[in-house]
């Protein structure tokens, strides 16, 4: 075997110099390892996912009427925060406004929001912000660049072509609307860990449709960094990061993979994050019971950490404000695993050995964690690492010594059998890796 060392590609951030606060926030973000994505809004009432307005036989007029009946009477921000914190997550990313244009916070920019446009009348984002502060979670905010409703989102892209939709507004008005809402979010809800943009890809078939200047991204990003210098900016545009972005996002794939067809871009030197669903849906879909097993999700988390990325795992709450029972069970199972193994996927960095068929590695200081996550029953693996010799090897959980042999090809580890989703070997070296 050939030694494989992880080496992310560099991405030029021309014209953008992050502040010291921002650089520190990036490292804190990398340390966090695990976050919870929350896709929730009026679309949950139909139980057909967050894209129902674009994909199903629902007109814009019919969809807008949903708000008049949206009343999540069982929403409990503290219950959510407790479940998320117990899972081992360090932050949440909440959908403040998805592509349907409905705002899940108190905004003066449009009456189409949860406070002014529903009988519920409560600012769920404010309640979540306060609950996150109480339970030690950082708050990140999802915000859609794409809008399927407003008449000033012009020209239309490849989605949101409702037959009755008007598109005779001014693009400059839409840009001003977004910046006004972002200002509200960054000045009214305490410290925000990141703004998570989505939807730029809607214009990817138009010449220049994703140009930063068309969207005035330099001005928008500068405004965000001015309002909260430590706030990171990520954009799920499925291309290499633009100047002003502080993290790189991968959708439904770990960095370096592209099984979903959305993540073919080069892996940058920025902090990395992979977003993934528990079942097959982002927003609540009543018929989607295809949940990944707890072991599968744990292995996905480990595989993401081994690629030096965070995992942002999605939950789609029901219209009454509760979390689906299977989602709660998965969170609890991940949390139980984190009680023992959390230190091997949080506060670490991926590598130094690239992912292999048997699993991945993470490291901190002079310690390397070898995560064996394959279903193979082999009791020996070759770790193709020749930069240094370990002085000690043991199973992370039991501290049982692991016999090892140093060869020209690397380190051969002989593992005890164990019925766990991730067998973790701790290797100690004389100096930092």
What annotation goes with each model-predicted range?
Residues 1-2:
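Sec-dependent signal peptide recognition
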Residues 7-8:
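N-terminal signal peptide c-region/cleavage motif recognized by signal peptidases
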Residues 13-433:
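Mature catalytic domains of secreted/periplasmic carbohydrate-active enzymes
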């Amino acid at each position: 075997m050939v030694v494989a060392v992880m080496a992310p590609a560099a991405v030029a951030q021309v014209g953008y110099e992050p502040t010291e606060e921002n650089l520190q926030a990036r490292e804190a973000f990398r340390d966090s390892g695990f976050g919870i994505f929350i896709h929730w809004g009026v679309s949950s009432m139909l139980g057909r996912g967050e894209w129902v307005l674009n994909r199903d036989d629902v007109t814009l007029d019919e969809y807008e009427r949903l708000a008049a009946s949206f009343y999540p009477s069982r929403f409990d921000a503290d219950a959510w925060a407790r479940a998320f914190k117990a899972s081992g997550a360090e932050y949440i990313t909440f959908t403040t406004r998805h592509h349907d244009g409905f705002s899940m916070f108190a905004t003066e920019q449009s009456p189409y929001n949860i406070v002014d446009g529903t009988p519920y009348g409560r600012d769920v984002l404010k309640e979540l912000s306060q609950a996150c502060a109480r339970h030690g979670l950082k708050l990140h905010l999802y915000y859609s660049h794409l809008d399927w409703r407003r008449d000033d989102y012009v020209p239309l892209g490849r989605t949101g072509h409702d037959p009755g939709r008007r598109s005779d507004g001014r693009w400059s008005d839409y840009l001003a609307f977004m910046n006004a809402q972002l200002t509200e979010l960054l000045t009214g809800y305490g410290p925000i860990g990141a703004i998570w943009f989505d939807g730029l890809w809607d214009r990817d078939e138009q010449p220049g449709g994703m140009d930063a200047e068309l969207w005035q991204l330099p001005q928008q990003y500068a405004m965000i960094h001015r309002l909260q210098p430590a706030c990171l900016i990520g954009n799920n545009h499925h291309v290499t990061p633009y100047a002003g972005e502080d993290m790189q996002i991968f959708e439904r794939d770990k960095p370096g993979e592209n099984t979903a067809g959305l993540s073919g871009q080069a892996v940058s030197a920025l902090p990395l994050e992979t977003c993934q669903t528990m079942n097959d849906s982002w927003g609540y879909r009543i018929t989607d019971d295809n949940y990944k097993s707890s072991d599968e999700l744990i292995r996905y988390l480990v595989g993401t950490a081994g690629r030096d990325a965070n995992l942002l795992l999605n939950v789609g709450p029901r219209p009454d404000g509760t979390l689906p029972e299977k989602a709660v069970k998965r969170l609890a199972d991940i949390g139980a695993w984190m009680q023992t193994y959390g230190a091997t996927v949080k506060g670490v960095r991926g590598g130094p050995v690239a992912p292999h068929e048997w699993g991945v590695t993470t490291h901190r200081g002079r310690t390397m964690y070898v995560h064996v996550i394959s279903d193979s029953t082999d009791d020996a693996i070759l770790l193709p690492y020749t930069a240094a010799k370990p002085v000690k090897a043991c199973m992370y959980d039991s501290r049982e010594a692991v016999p090892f042999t140093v060869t020209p090809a690397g380190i051969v580890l002989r593992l005890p059998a164990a019925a766990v989703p991730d067998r973790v070997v701790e290797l100690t070296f004389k100096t930092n890796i």
